[in-house]
Amino acid sequence: LDLRNDPGGLLQAAIGVSAAFLPEKSDVVSIKGRTPQSDYAFKAVEKDYRSGNAAKALAELTPAAKTVPLVVLINSSSASASEIVAGALQDHKRAVLLGDRSFGKGSVQTILPMTFGEKTVGVKLTTARYYTPSGRSIQARGIEPDFYVDDTPKGNFPTFQVREADLAHHLANQQDAKKSDKDKKAEAEALPYDD
């Protein structure tokens, strides 16, 4: 499963792709927001990959997809939804991850519509963090592959070696025991959570 240079997409699509390769009712991802009411756990359910947009791409999927040996390719441009898939498959020991550490986007955004006169705009607000089935936060850390392999220097899809942790004011990972003063300040300014 090649997730290199996949910047992510919809949460439901990531859950659907994960469900295609995991046993029924396996944990895929959990989301934790500011309040317990916003916490939610998503499980692998067949309807998630046999309905909606995923139905066409995965309609011919055989039951063997859940047991065939699987390798997932990731790199520094694998982000967000692709990290959800890679993390779920790795945590369940369903796949071996090969490549480079992923981008490290472990946050959930919500688009809030705002109307100004006749114009409607949207504000993207970070509202939660997501965690792999084992409880790992990949925010600003990324997913570590099981085996490191450098990207080829030449190819059709050059990658940028920029990760979430390289961005100014990135959301820090709360699971990091040792945080720099810069990370603590960035976290306080970005979105203060109490874990």
Please give the residue ranges for each predicted region:
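C-terminal "post-core" interaction segments
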Residues: 3-195
